[in-house]
Design a protein with these regions (language model features):
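Fungal secretory targeting signals
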Residues: 1-21
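Signature for phosphate-centric chemistry
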Residues: 18-167, 171-332, 336-467
Length: 467
């Protein structure tokens, strides 16, 4: 199946692409060979399946029938943002203006290296067949979304066999919208899908997939005092090593940090990155945990505002589950950003909020939070609601792995009995108040998420934004 998808994507892209990104012959031996480092790139690199799957089968438990399916997905693999590209270019400027032969792990720059950001119009955008640096790149956001669609049909195709007309929802970020459209394309032309584009502007208030944007109370520097405790001398070690090998280069610890971003985004658009080979395995581990720390304390359980922000989408999800018997649509697919998914998972309780991460050292026992496990590019969180005999159950599948609710998993396939789930959900949102905690009224008078229910009459079509 995958081979046929590749062929169809290549054929369509060849028709639409003016210039084919052939890349260099040397790329052939390297492309797709660095998958072992992807989990250490903090979610900036390509999609991969959740490593801690507990061995639980993704199959529907025997004798059960799926009643409703929800999915919240992240946009696919992409180029860096404009701001991130600025820092990468700053480091590239130092390297490209170095007048001597490179030594050590930078020797690849002697071999007619082509910087991976060849056109600024690609910044912020999904990586595609047409805008990749190499035609053989297996990690494009375009291919990821289309492959996801085919895997969706293989896993859940029976859910849409008799429901060929339905809506798919996306934020109006262009890369999220593109991911949704590529996913729809991957489903095939047998479906009549209405793509609803929901604004992520702060004026949308609660009626959004991106509640964090409607939260003026959000403090982007929160918990910096904790994060500052983390030992980042490994970045100095990287810079010193490169400078020692290359006299007069004068890279800084900031440059060393930037090289990790360079590595991740180049893999997204070239299929591999020689920059990734600069780092030792220990350095990758230290960088990865630094990303975990930052996420935990600024986008996850370590920031007390997050549970309220995530409750906006979680409450809507629970409402859809409760209305499963009366809703004409039983598949709800949405595409947004990593921050929104992290907020959502925090409210659900999938991310452990009982034990704060330490900044004093890298913990190897008892640490269950790894940013890139939850939100690699192309991440997807499924909510499955199924009936077995006369009882109904709910469970979550994240990036191809069933992740049970630890305190409610005695049902078939480690699911949670529906009434127990509703009790659990009520406890999770107790004390949360998105509108009040975020001071939403200062930017919007929209107090409810309604697009799942009124899309057929409102027809959401927000202007696409390159962000």
């Amino acid at each position: 199946m995958f081979k046929s998808i590749v062929c169809s994507v290549l054929a369509a892209s060849l028709v639409n692409a003016g210039t084919i990104p052939l890349g260099k012959l040397a790329d052939v031996a390297k492309i797709g060979t660095q998958e072992e480092i992807i989990p250490f790139l903090g979610g900036a690199g390509p999609y991969y399946s959740f490593p801690g799957d507990y061995g639980i089968s993704r199959d529907l438990p025997e004798g059960c029938e799926m009643k409703q399916l929800q999915m919240v997905g992240r946009h696919g693999e992409r180029y860096p943002t404009t701001s991130k590209a600025k820092t990468i270019k700053k480091t590239w400027y130092k390297l490209s203006n170095y007048t001597r032969q490179f030594n050590g792990s930078l020797t690849f720059l002697n071999d007619d290296y082509e910087f991976f950001i060849t056109d600024d119009k690609n910044l912020e955008m999904e990586s595609t067949f047409a805008n990749s640096v190499d035609v053989l790149n297996p990690y494009t956001g375009e291919m990821d979304a289309k492959r996801h669609a085919r895997e969706f049909l293989q896993q859940y195709g029976y859910m849409v066999e008799n429901q060929t007309d339905f809506a798919v929802f996306t934020s109006n970020s262009e890369r999220c919208h593109d991911t949704a459209q590529y996913f729809i394309d991957g489903l095939g032309d047998q479906f009549n899908i209405s793509l609803q584009t929901i604004s992520e502007a702060e004026s949308s208030g609660a009626n959004t997939l991106s509640a964090c944007n409607s939260c003026p109370a959000w403090d982007y520097d929160v918990n910096d005092d904790i994060l500052d405790e983390y030992d980042t001398t490994y970045l100095n070690d990287i810079a010193n090593r490169l400078n020692k090998d290359n006299k007069g280069l004068n890279l800084t610890s900031d440059d060393a940090s930037t090289l990790f971003d360079w590595c991740a985004y180049e893999v997204n658009v070239r299929g591999y990155s020689d920059v990734c080979d600069i780092f030792s395995k220990d350095e990758l581990v230290r960088y990865s945990y630094g990303q975990d720390l930052e996420t935990f304390y600024q986008q996850g359980p370590g920031y007390d505002i997050i549970k309220s922000v995530g409750s906006n989408l979680f409450n809507a999800s629970v409402k859809l589950l409760k209305q499963s018997k009366t809703q004409a649509q039983n598949v709800w697919l949405s595409f947004t950003h990593d921050t929104d998914i992290l907020n959502y998972l925090t409210t659900i309780g999938i991310i452990d909020d009982k034990n704060n991460l330490t900044a004093e050292y890298v913990p190897f026992m008892g640490n269950t939070f790894h940013r890139s496990w939850y939100v690699p590019q192309g991440a997807r969180v499924y909510t499955e609601m199924f009936q077995c005999s006369n009882d109904t159950y709910v469970r979550y599948a994240i990036n191809d792995a069933v992740i049970p609710i630890e305190t409610c998993s005695t049902g078939p396939g480690f699911s949670c009995e529906i009434n127990e789930f509703y009790d659990y959900a009520e406890k999770r949102v107790a004390g949360t108040d998105f509108l009040k905690v975020c001071n939403v009224s200062s930017v919007s008078n929209v107090t409810e998420l309604t697009f799942f229910w009124d899309w057929n009459t409102t027809h959401y079509n927000a202007t696409l934004l390159k962000q």
